UniProtKB/Swiss-Prot annotation:
<dbReference type="InterPro" id="IPR013083">
    <property type="entry name" value="Znf_RING/FYVE/PHD"/>
</dbReference>
<keyword id="KW-0862">Zinc</keyword>
<dbReference type="Pfam" id="PF13639">
    <property type="entry name" value="zf-RING_2"/>
</dbReference>
<protein>
    <recommendedName>
        <fullName>RING finger protein 44</fullName>
    </recommendedName>
</protein>
<feature type="zinc finger region" description="RING-type; atypical">
    <location>
        <begin position="355"/>
        <end position="396"/>
    </location>
</feature>
<dbReference type="GO" id="GO:0008270">
    <property type="term" value="F:zinc ion binding"/>
</dbReference>
<keyword id="KW-0479">Metal-binding</keyword>
<feature type="region of interest" description="Disordered">
    <location>
        <begin position="26"/>
        <end position="58"/>
    </location>
</feature>
<dbReference type="InterPro" id="IPR001841">
    <property type="entry name" value="Znf_RING"/>
</dbReference>
<keyword id="KW-0863">Zinc-finger</keyword>
Length: 407
């Protein structure tokens, strides 16, 4: 059972079953109406709806059907208090066609009316101010129900008198998704976000204060249907029925929200260029350079005479530091001139008992050779050493000078 069906068919105990008496009165304030006995009753006309459809107010697109409520003056006993609020605000919103009128409504002029069920407001009728009330009709809303999500949300919305006559519409009207967003038209909308939040709601695209799906499109409207606009301002005073049915109303689609409170960090700066863009300049900078080649450019055509002169000067400098050139070792005649004797441990007077060339102890009857520095060695070991060197293996003294000085 639908909530609006409960609102019109569930009679209170004090009222008869046949009719429901509604008492209203005009209060001192221009924006409120308080209940008083005015002989108003509410009944539902099911004959106006097509066969096979039940009257509904706002529902998904697959179950859309017209819903009409007539207000008739009728005297009845057992009144039930009913209060509603009238608020006049600038009209902006999405179009609501109301081209049919049913006679029999009250002669009082009502700017607008709305109903709140369980904290949510729903519009019931939209009437032009210059005319007397003849009918209150709710036509079938074109498009799926998520085209009008603010009507089933917790925000406050009401119907208001239409703006001046709009310009004639073309033969084929654009779908509802192409209307200008409510947020751009109305600067005082309560749904504006002052912080830097961004809601990503699935495949739906935000359009002003409500979202619409790109996959669902509403039927084209006839050019003869007048357009009345629903405003987007909060309702200051409410019309409430004591029928709790919040669990029966369609809820908002649960979507996952992502919040970005801080801006993304800037991209890192590009790395500075390397000092050596290639290997060749780096390699050339590491090469040694002579004083003659230092200049703005590197010349590879060097004079051969200059190179030879430079090398010769370097050799002369080395010869001055080394002294006169001498033969590498002693000749065989020079080696034989060195004194030698047979080793006898009883008559041996030197403290040296081994050969430093072969690291062997002196034995009896071995031939020893004595160098001018008085160092003794095996004759075979030291002769071989003197053929390649001119110095003593122990003290590095010249072995060829001492004998000549002795002579």
């Amino acid at each position: 059972m639908r909530p609006w069906t409960l609102a019109v068919t569930k009679w209170p105990p004090s009222a008869p079953v046949g009719h429901w008496r509604v008492s209203t009165r005009l209060s001192s304030s221009p924006g409120q109406l308080w209940g008083r006995p005015s002989n108003l009753s509410v009944e539902e006309h099911r004959a106006s709806a097509p066969a096979g459809r039940s009257p509904r107010m706002l529902h998904p697109a697959t179950q859309q059907s017209p819903f009409m409520v007539d207000l008739h003056e009728q005297v009845h006993q057992g009144p039930v208090p009913l209060s509603y609020t009238v608020t006049t605000v600038t009209t902006q919103g999405f179009p609501l066609p109301t081209s049919q009128h049913i006679p029999g409504c009250s002669a009082q002029q009502l700017p607008a009316c709305s109903v709140m069920f369980s904290g949510q407001h729903y519009p019931l009728c939209c009437l032009p101010p210059p005319q007397l009330i003849q009918a209150c009709t709710m036509q079938q809303l074109p498009g799926p129900y998520h085209t009008y999500p603010h009507l089933i949300s917790s925000d406050h919305y009401i119907l208001h008198p239409p703006p001046p006559a709009p310009p004639p519409q073309p033969t084929h009207m654009a779908p509802l998704g192409q209307f200008v967003s409510l947020q751009t038209q109305h600067p005082r909308m309560p749904l504006q976000r002052l912080d830097n939040e961004m809601d990503l709601r699935g495949d739906q695209h935000p359009l002003g204060s409500f979202t619409y799906s790109t996959s669902a499109t509403g039927p084209a409207l006839s050019p003869s249907v007048p357009l009345h606009y629903l405003p987007h301002d909060p309702l200051h005073q409410e019309l409430s029925f004591g029928v709790p049915y919040s669990h029966m109303m369609p809820r908002r689609l649960s979507t996952q929200r992502y919040r970005l409170q801080q801006p993304l960090p800037p991209p890192p700066p590009p790395p500075p260029p390397s000092y050596y863009p290639s290997f060749l300049p780096y390699f050339l900078s590491m090469l040694p350079m002579s004083p003659t080649t230092v200049g703005p450019t590197i010349s590879l055509d060097l004079d051969v005479d200059d190179v030879e002169m430079e090398n010769y000067e370097a050799l002369l400098n080395l010869a001055e530091r080394l002294g006169d050139a001498k033969p590498r070792g002693l000749t065989k005649a020079d080696i034989e001139q060195l004194p030698s004797y047979r080793f006898n441990p009883d008559s041996h007077q030197s403290e040296q008992t081994l050969c430093v060339v072969c690291f062997s102890d002196f034995e009896v009857r071995q031939l020893l050779r004595v160098l001018p520095c008085n160092h003794e060695f095996h004759a075979k070991c030291v002769d071989k050493w003197l053929k390649a060197n001119r110095t003593c293996p122990i003290c590095r003294a010249d072995a060829s000078e001492v004998p000549r000085e002795a002579e």
